[in-house]
Amino acid sequence: MRAGHYENRKESVDIMIRSSREIIDDLIGYGVDFERDDNGHLRFTREGAHSTPRILFHEDITGKEITSKLLAQVQKLPNVTILENTEMVDIVEQDNVCYGIVCRVSKEAMPHLITISAKDTVWACGGIGGLYTHSTNFPHLTGDALALSLRHHIELENIDYIQIHPTTLYSEKPGRRFLISESVRGEGAILLNRKGERFVDELLPRDVVARAIYEQMEKDDMPYVHLSLENIDKKTIMEHFPNIYQHCLEEGYDITKESIPVVPAQHYFMGGVHV
C-alpha cells in the first residue's frame, strides 16, 4: 500500500496477498520451475520497495517461465480454441449488450473479418507499450481495446497509471527494450551518473527510482545512466542472470567487467476497464 501511495484498491491488494500461496502452489503444479536451494527450499530474491527478499524467480526469465507453462496448460484444455494472428477490431453490440467480437484474421494469404458470437465476453485489454519510444512490451500492443471501450461507452479508470521500469538496456535500435531485472539491483547492482557517482537508493519504489534516473539524465545531458554490477560476484551473475549476461554480451557489454547503459521504459499499464 505504501509503495502505491495508498491509492491502491484495498480489496484487490488483500485478494492478491491472501491468495498468493495458493497461486504459487498452482504454478508449481503446472510445472513452473522456481529456483530452489540445495535442500529443495524455494529461493527468494529482493526487488524495489521490499524490506526483505520475498520474490520467487527462475533465473532471470521468470515471466517467460510462468507464461510458457500456463500456455501449455491452456493448450491441453479440450474446450479452448486458440486463434493466432487474429486481431479484434470491434464489439458486436445491441441494446448495450455485448454478443461477441469482430476479428481480422491475417494468417491466410487474404486477410478477412470473422465474427465470434459469445454469450459472455471477457474484456481483457492488455498493454499499451507500442505507443512509447521506450517500452518492454511488444510494439503491436497499442491499446486498441481501450479505444473500443471508449467507443462503446465502457467505463475506464486509472488510465494515467502507467508503470515505468527504471532499468532497461539503452539502445538506439527500434523495437522493445530489453529488461534489466529489478532483482539485479536487489542483488547489489548500483546506479551511477556520468561521473561514476551513485545518486539514488536503487531499491526504492519503481516510480521513485525512474524519476531519479530521468532527473540525472537531464543533469548529465545523457540519454541514459550507468548500472554497475561490481558488487555482485561473477558466480551469482552467471547463475542468477544468465540471459541478461548473454544478451548484454551480444550487445557488446560484459556485465562482469563493466557497467551498462540503462534507461527507464514503459513496462506495465495499471489502469483499464472498471471492474
PLM regions and their residue ranges:
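Short hydrophobic core segments
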Residues: T115-G126, S149, G196
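An anion/pyrophosphate-binding glycine-rich loop and adjacent beta-alpha core
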Residues: L148, I154-H267
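Conserved redox-cofactor binding core of oxidoreductases
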Residues: I28-H112, K119, A124, T168-S171, ...
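Hydrophobic or amphipathic alpha-helical targeting/insertion segments
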Residues: S20-I23, V32, A145, R151-H152
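Flavin (primarily FAD) binding-site architecture
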Residues: W123-N137
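Glycine-rich active-site loop/strand segments that organize a redox cofactor
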Residues: M1-M16
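A glycine-rich dinucleotide-binding beta-alpha-beta segment and adjacent secondary-structure elements
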Residues: L83-E84, V89-R104, I244-V275
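Extended, hydrophobic alpha-helical segments in both membrane/secreted and soluble proteins
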Residues: T121, L141-L148, V275
